[in-house]
Amino acid sequence: MATARARAALVFVALLQMAAVVVVRASHVVYPELQSLEAKHVDGKLRTGYHFQPPKHWINDPNGPMYYKGLYHLFYQYNPKGAVWGNIEWAHSVSTDLIDWTALEPGIYPSKTFDEKGCWSGSATVLPSGVPVIMYTGIDPDERQVQNVAYPVNLSDPYLREWYKPDYNPIINPDGGINASAFRDPTTAWYGPDGHWRLLVGSKVNMKGLAVLYRSRDFKKWVKAHHPLHSAHTGMWECPDFFPVAVAGGSRHYRRGVDTAELHDAAVAEEVKYVLKVSLDLTRYEYYTVGWYDHATDRYVPDAAFPDNDYGLRYDYGDFYASKSFYDPAKRRRIVWGWANESDTVPDDRRKGWAGIQAIPRKLWLSADGKQLVQWPVEELKALRAKHVNVTDKVIKKGNYFEVTGFKSVQSDVDMAFAIKDLSKAEEFDPAWRTDAEALCKKLGSDVDGGVGPFGLWALASGDLKERTAVFFRVFKANDSSHVVLMCNDPTRSSYESKIYRPTFAGFVDVDIAKNKQIALRTLIDHSVVESFGARGKTCILTRVYPRKAVGDDAHLFVFNNGESDVKVTNLDAWEMKTPKMNAEE
């Protein structure tokens, strides 16, 4: 990512090289000799304690999340036969609280001609009658990606254990100039004022990503619109998501989710904007825009303030992909799920017997100023908090650090706030850095002394600090005398293992730090995951790490400051986290 065309070309080459190292697995490169080798042993040393994952084998995209008859449902892409991608079906789990999960029988699996070579990602739509419907991408005998529908066998069953696929599938074929090998991941459908249902399917034409729009009166026959809902020159769009969010100026309850069914109310419709999120197959990042949607013309126009390209805002600046949101009617909120892939190697995954987790489900809403989305772990997560320690008003001078003791940090929730009294020592900010936070983080890592910062946490650290994952802030001074805050997750020293992929992840934080000279950081630590939320959820970064020494009781937590300006930890609350019921069979 860069501002100059020539530099952008170099970065593009680098991204391709990066993909060759690790991302190809996320792009579903097939290992025929490995995909059906069942794990005989599951190595639990680095398995997460409270993040969602099945007992063994490969998982990827979250699919069809919904709430039905008192239960949260999550389907997800799963290989029942091995720890690499292949044999994909929709595994199915249910929960009453988004924390404890029970595994059920697979919801959708290859069983018909129209999906005999795979059941890929999709979404759930709850019809006005209360009937839930799954729409998903099937791979047919000709390797075409087609869109199919499935209905519950028994609507009185809150577990929705069985699904049937009507014979009139596929309901959408890749006709009319659509690339049959790049046509997948249908969205949740929405009902328009003209009596038509609408949904999007991700696709591309050359390097242009497309959100292809389809309409239907009966949810059976779907007709392609003359134009996509939206497009941009970013490469293939996977896992599109399109949904309304409340605007603060129009509602006192702007943090609530908005159900598309409510949009028939004209007053509600005037108080919302729309979010279009896409997952970029080329870079394996996601980005989103916020804008206006015209129901009459079926046009979506992003607000000018939102970059409509791969420099755009992201849900998460780390290892977070193929996200899918849903409206939770029980608590009137929108929740987003995201897949966190492994960063180790295929042999490592086979040895472990598992690969992939889901990020902690997050509540999502539009910020009060309308400039970005904000995310925060669902409130139910607090039920797992156990032993607690607290630190207050502790000043850290340049080059100093302290250990947070009295609890086990390897599976923990750490919520803290920093105060910076003196911002005068902030380094000058080069405007060219604005489009490449990751490169800036890599250049100015946690061990590079600065003016204001770097300051933050060393998580999953060994006692001698030779292994550690840094989560930190660094403050710069811009030409207009405002301040720019950089947030980084730096795993370059996270493990003695040399063959794993350890990129720095970073994003800028939209906060006026000069106003109150404070910034908050919450970090969820879970054996091989460091999931951080800066400035109360304005910037989120998830990192996968694989320490060799900093495991179990040998994992430590430190707070550090390598900046000239003193930093005060005004408050730090840390909790050990209990292990919930995680996908044991009913």
From Swiss-Prot:
First-level EC class: hydrolase
EC number(s) per entry: 3.2.1.26
Active site: D61
Domain of life from the UniProt record: Eukaryota
Glycosylation site residues: N154, N179, N341, N390, N479
An example Gene Ontology biological process: carbohydrate metabolic process
Residues reported in the UniProt entry to bind substrate: W58, I59, N60, D61, Q77, W85, W120, S121, R184, D185, E238, D281
Signal sequence segment: 1-26
UniProt record similarity statement: Belongs to the glycosyl hydrolase 32 family.
Cystine bridges: C441-C488
Annotated protein name in UniProt: Beta-fructofuranosidase, insoluble isoenzyme 3
Tissues in which the protein is found: Weakly expressed in flowers.
GO CC annotation terms, alphabetical: apoplast
Coiled coil regions in record: none
Catalytic activity: Hydrolysis of terminal non-reducing beta-D-fructofuranoside residues in beta-D-fructofuranosides
